[in-house]
Amino acid sequence: MNSPNESDGMSGREPSLEILPRTSLHSIPVTVEVKPVLPRAMPSSMGGGGGGSPSPVELRGALVGSVDPTLREQLLQQELLALKQQQQLQKQLLFAEFQKQHDHLTRQHEVQLQKHLKQQQEMLAAKQQQEMLAAKRQQELEQQRQREQQRQEELEKQRLEQQLLILRNKEKSKESAIASTEVKLRLQEFLLSKSKEPTPGGLNHSLPQHPKCWGAHHASLDQSSPPQSGPPGTPPSYKLPLPGPYDSRDDFPLRKTASEPNLKVRSRLKQKVAERRSSPLLRRKDGTVISTFKKRAVEITGAGPGASSVCNSAPGSGPSSPNSSHSTIAENGFTGSVPNIPTEMLPQHRALPLDSSSNQFSLYTSPSLPNISLGLQATVTVTNSHLTASPKLSTQQEAERQALQSLRQGGTLTGKFMSTSSIPGCLLGVALEGDGSPHGHASLLQHVLLLEQARQQSTLIAVPLHGQSPLVTGERVATSMRTVGKLPRHRPLSRTQSSPLPQSPQALQQLVMQQQHQQFLEKQKQQQLQLGKILTKTGELPRQPTTHPEETEEELTEQQEALLGEGALTMPREGSTESESTQEDLEEEDEEEDGEEEEDCIQVKDEEGESGAEEGPDLEEPGAGYKKLFSDAQPLQPLQVYQAPLSLATVPHQALGRTQSSPAAPGGMKSPPDQPVKHLFTTGVVYDTFMLKHQCMCGNTHVHPEHAGRIQSTWSRLQETGLLSKCERIRGRKATLDEIQTVHSEYHTLLYGTSPLNRQKVDSKKLLGPISQKMYAVLPCGGIGVDSDTVWNEMHSSSAVRMAVGCLLELAFKVAAGELKNGFAIIRPPGHHAEESTAMGFCFFNSVAITAKLLQQKLNVGKVLIVDWDIHHGNGTQQAFYNDPSVLYISLHRYDNGNFFPGSGAPEEVGGGPGVGYNVNVAWIGGVDPPIGDVEYLTAFRTVVMPIAHEFSPDVVLVSAGFDAVEGHLSPLGGYSVTARCFGHLTRQLMTLAGGRVVLALEGGHDLTAICDASEACVSALLSVELQPLDEAVLQQKPNINAVATLEKVIEIQSKHWSCVQKFAAGLGRSLREAQAGETEEAETVSAMALLSVGAEQAQAAAAREHSPRPAEEPMEQEPAL
């Protein structure tokens, strides 16, 4: 092998592979193709048939045998290295090209993006410019409209000024104005009505003889009052026309013409009156009548022979009649001592202006129409004024005049005058009082106007017309000059001498008889109810709830009661001034309402020995009744069975008792001291139907979970099961505002504790409250409420919420005083969410918190335990006692880490200040998966509630018994699966505290079946009725994980304050059966240890006796010798 061949072979192998030129690389971005040159020449060369120069492959094949394998391997390696270098170079070129293209596209995208942003900015600027132009155009249009409106106003003003100028500059011969068609028709009707022949129908009264009283008192003809309507058979009358200014120079309301002088008009009208007035009694033209209750017949007599009645004054006694020293005559009216009725103006009456000079209450004084004075102030001198008698008096009127004159002289009514059919009782005192102050008419007018307004808003109330006004008969001077007297505040004022007398006394007498018959029926009904109470008492029949028929009209008549004072049956209060506080007025009104309830409703408890003076509870001095009650040993003989370790110095209410004057309880029939009431010391139940009236004004109970059916169904369930017959029915009352203010603020108390009528007497500044606090909101149902679910009824809710508080107070005080063993209050609305100044969650006043406060203040109760097992946390109760160590609050509620209403009640909330540790929150977590049930509640009572309660050792236990944790309530209002039977067992456990003084108050719970079942179970437990045992599955079940975690956290927090709960931390996961077995083993171990210790002591004592030296034997006695 020579070198040329080798070199040729080497050189021939080099160009075997051809790399694509660089120009082609730019067109191929990713892949590189390497292919051999002359691929088709290989078969020809291999065939050997062709000629030509050999290819490198052929040469390589020819040199295969001659080339060394080592050298061939080196050649191949060199070729591979060259290929790798070429490929690496191509990759670099491709990456550079890719980077270049990427940069180019990026720059292009940025340019497009900037162009797009620029277009958007231009469009936004154009839009803003269009809006500015539109606003500017709108502003210009508004300004143009305003200018147009001002121009129209100026034109109208100029037109009116021109018309006025034309009227001012008119000629005297032209008319100043043209009357409209309506005015002409009204004037024509008025003149036609005057031209008709009047018939007798009433007295014709007018103003006294004074120049100013004979003026035109109407600015127009349509100012007369509309006619009133009333029952048939009552005498017609007129109402007070609207007051109008008058000119004393005008004599009559009709306009004078230039052709008729004053004297001609006066003489012609007098002649017309004399011709057409055949009787002084005139009938109302429109034929309407008015009830006799609003029209009081008036018959005022003088005191001597020189004075007589006003009735049927002479028709011709007009202004031109001569005056004398004994007679000052007012046509169709009355003067003298009659206007001077002694009266005492109430504060609201004094607000009306009194101006005798201008006589703002002047009346229409047409000579042919009757004038109703309504007790206007007399303008003549009192010392020179007397009454003149009509020349013709009917027999009945003459008899009435003699009767009144006899009364004024100190005599008595005899014969047919005893019925007082024609003499109202309110006028008897008037007839006896004599002359009064000269301002009697004006003040009486103001009083009557306010009284009429109150009467239009209330129903007819029967008021006895005799036996109410104190008849003063001593030292009466029978002259027209009498000392000024005062009308007692309690005397009911009515329409006085302004009303005409009826044609005959039959109508008024019939009304009096109806009123007396109605009173007789009410009294008979009350006696029958009392008699039925005695008959059913021994038979253990269930007592029906006390109804309040008068409560339906209570709120509407409160304004009238305020005007009438304290009522006709009470003594007049001396020294009453208008400086009385608002609180005293409201409490006085509440006393009157409670007094009415005491008269009309059945007495619930028969505690003999009460005096007749103790008819109603005195809410102002709450301890007076119990002080007298506990001082009497005979009626409290049954109370010696149970001694309450409480101080009974003051009690805020008085026990109800039957008076000795009742026909059903004669004075000679007294139960012997050794015969106690059979079921006195038992469970008390309180319920009142007035709480049913708290409901939404929409009337749809389906959209409101808290409705009246809750307590109504509970009461019915207790009746059906017979449990109510085993209980003592306690009558409730309305809580006073002072009692409510022990927990709530004054603004909150007045806002939700007063009705719209008695709220008028409250200072408006007290009702303003915080500016940020809104009062009411409109609900989707159409009613109103304080929030989305707490409804409010403006007429009845205030009384209902106060009744709920008062019912619980009555029951709790009787239990604390030892009269009852325990109690269950069926009340609504609930109260444990109500805070000091906030109403929420169906709650307005916190009944349980108020009761706890008053038990401590009035009965000196030391420690109170409040257990709240409502599924919602009682945020209001916790707030009231958060810093109070004398009240222990334990709540079991659904918490869910603050995600369940109301969001409060975390386990870390343990109290503040001196009350740290006296607030225990068992706050369940985990939602309703799984739901909390009987096992969890019983475990909480076993490990937390009862140990802490026993260590606290309360005097009274109050339970906020909400039953919305009972199965049947959906998740928003409940969601747990506690059975009603479980709450009976929880109640039984609580009865081991405080000597059994446990009071349950109904709180939440909106499923009727659930709350009825739970209430039945709780009342059965309170009555010590054998309860249905728990299921074995419940006793074997273990608490769920969420409940165990909750109780572990509560024990960890509360163990710092109550060491008794520490020992239960280890056994939280055990079932009730296992826990009972463990406690039994522990108890047996303790007992065995105690027995062993006792046995050891006895053995030691025996051994000591054996080792001790025997005492010296005493010599035996010698027997006597036989």
From Swiss-Prot:
The family database entries (SUPFAM superfamilies) matched by this protein are listed as: Arginase/deacetylase
Q: Where is the composition biased (Low complexity)?
A: 312-327, 494-504
Q: Where is this region: Histone deacetylase?
A: 684-1028
For the cross-link Glycyl lysine isopeptide (Lys-Gly) (interchain with G-Cter in SUMO2), list the residue numbers.
Answer: 35
Q: Which ranges belong to the motif Nuclear export signal?
A: 1081-1122
The answer on whether this UniProt entry bears the keyword Phosphoprotein reads yes
Residues the record lists as N6-acetyllysine modifications: 533
Per UniProt, Zn(2+) binds at: 696, 698, 704, 781
UniProt lists compositionally biased (Acidic residues) regions at: 581-621
Q: Which Gene3D superfamilies does this chain map to?
A: 6.10.250.1550, Histone deacetylase domain (3.40.800.20)
Post-translational modifications reported in the UniProt record: Phosphorylated by AMPK, CaMK1, SIK1 and PRKD1 at Ser-259 and Ser-498. The phosphorylation is required for the export to the cytoplasm and inhibition. Phosphorylated by the PKC kinases PKN1 and PKN2, impairing nuclear import. Phosphorylated by GRK5, leading to nuclear export of HDAC5 and allowing MEF2-mediated transcription. Ubiquitinated. Polyubiquitination however does not lead to its degradation.
Location in the cell reads:
Nucleus; Cytoplasm
Query: Which reactions appear under catalytic activity for this entry?
Result: N(6)-acetyl-L-lysyl-[histone] + H2O = L-lysyl-[histone] + acetate
Compositional bias ranges of the Polar residues kind? 328-340
Bias type Basic and acidic residues, positions? 247-258, 272-281, 1104-1113
The ranges of region (Disordered) come to 1-22, 196-281, 302-343, 481-504, 536-625, 1097-1122
Assign the protein's first listed, main location to one coarse class.
Answer: nucleus
UniProt GO molecular function: histone deacetylase activity, hydrolytic mechanism; metal ion binding
Instruction: List the InterPro entries.
Output: HDAC4/5/7/9 (IPR046949), His_deacetylse (IPR000286), His_deacetylse_dom (IPR023801), His_deacetylse_dom_sf (IPR037138), Hist_deacetylase_Gln_rich_N (IPR024643), Ureohydrolase_dom_sf (IPR023696)
Annotated positions of the Phosphothreonine modification: 292
- Active-site residues are 833
Q: What is its EC number?
A: 3.5.1.98
**What quaternary structure, including any partners, is listed in this protein's UniProt entry?**
Interacts with AHRR, BAHD1, BCOR, HDAC7, HDAC9, CTBP1, MEF2C, NCOR2, NRIP1, PHB2 and a 14-3-3 chaperone protein. Interacts with BCL6, DDIT3/CHOP, GRK5, KDM5B and MYOCD. Interacts with EP300 in the presence of TFAP2C. Interacts with ANKRA2. Interacts with CUL7 (as part of the 3M complex); negatively regulated by ANKRA2. Interacts with ZBTB7B; the interaction allows the recruitment of HDAC4 on CD8 loci for deacetylation and possible inhibition of CD8 genes expression. Interacts with RARA.
Family as reported in the entry's similarity comment: Belongs to the histone deacetylase family. HD type 2 subfamily.
Function per UniProt? Responsible for the deacetylation of lysine residues on the N-terminal part of the core histones (H2A, H2B, H3 and H4). Histone deacetylation gives a tag for epigenetic repression and plays an important role in transcriptional regulation, cell cycle progression and developmental events. Histone deacetylases act via the formation of large multiprotein complexes. Involved in muscle maturation by repressing transcription of myocyte enhancer MEF2C. During muscle differentiation, it shuttles into the cytoplasm, allowing the expression of myocyte enhancer factors.
This protein is called Histone deacetylase 5
Record the organism. Answer: Pongo abelii (Sumatran orangutan)
